[in-house]
Amino acid sequence: MSPGVEALLEQARSGLQRLTPHETVAAVRGGALLIDTRTERHRREQGDLPGAIVIDRTVLEWRLDPASPWRIPEATGYDREIVVVCRHGYSSSLAAASLQTLGLRRATDMIGGVQGWISAGLPLSEHPADVRP
């Protein structure tokens, strides 16, 4: 019998130094990439985060792997700090663990996702999202 998704999530998080929303703000100010993997519908419902780059979860690894021909220009090296966010902080943990497996050792996610950001009273963006194909 499979150990289940909770065990998978626990294993993924065991290798992450997850950040609070306020720690995420500080990390982004220090140069970390803030990557939003939420769908357009969820971004419309919750709002966009200032400075976030929106990348669809299905292509995340290709866009952030510095060795990939499909990387975004900001994917400059394996030592780049990356903070992944989703709605509630579950799928972002799995995504960050996958990025670490690629060699992006400083990839992590934000505790509580965008809902945690909102609950912490942090501002949402007043500008259109930076959506990358």
Can you annotate each of these PLM segments?
Residues 85:
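Short, surface-exposed ligand- or partner-binding patches at beta-edge/loop junctions that are enriched
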Residues 1-33, 40-81, 90-133:
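Rhodanese-like catalytic fold shared by cysteine-dependent sulfurtransferases
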